[in-house]
Amino acid sequence: SYVFQSDKIAHSSYSKALCAAATMVPYTTFSSALDSLVDLCCNPKQTPFYCFVYLADIDSMGHRYGIASDFFSNAVIDCWKLIENHYWTPLRKSGKRIATLFTADHGMSPVDPDKTLYLNNSFPSILPALKKDTQGRILAPSGSCRDLFLHVQEEKLLEIASFLEKKLKGIADVVLTKKMMKEGFFGVASERLQQRIANLVILPYYKEAVWWFEKNRFEQHFFAAHGGLTPQEMESICLFLPHV
């Protein structure tokens, strides 16, 4: 199997771990990735083979400018134009029968940087109850503004959960991570995951954002985000064509 990713993320720790068993094909432009993909489809080294091609531009424009912006719309249009010109057309001419699946790994919720609730600023009383590392620094934040995970001292967990549930009423759900594990949100939770994951998670409602503030380190500048459990984030498209 082959993974085509932007050279900006192809060699990240996450990519190396997730794609360890595949051949990584870094690219500088999406059009060049599609050209390489077609070449591989027309001249496979072995069959069957699988190719995964990831385009981050649509996601990036959504984050930076919002999903109602022209930047986002143009990124979607440009994506399909490039696919038509650099994938569909040359592949049709080749006569190769290649099954193709299109999907987005998530949707998005609009968020407003100016209306983001910064948990540590809004409720500083919870800070002493959070776990710290060996250097005495609070273990926060984890996740994102759409799924903020907190490492709470076990003896304070229920107290903090109850406090935040009241304070965030109408803004977010506050859920024990163990409850989500039992309900299958993390699949089969490995022992390592259970040891490392935070024990409390804040899941903002649609259009809400809850994050952590540290100037020039942790700030919320996005106009759309994902990670929560709203249908707009969780549901996606899946287009399958048996062959071109």
Question: Where are the predicted features?
Answer:
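Feature captures the catalytic ectodomains and active-site-proximal regions of enzymes
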Residues: S1-V244
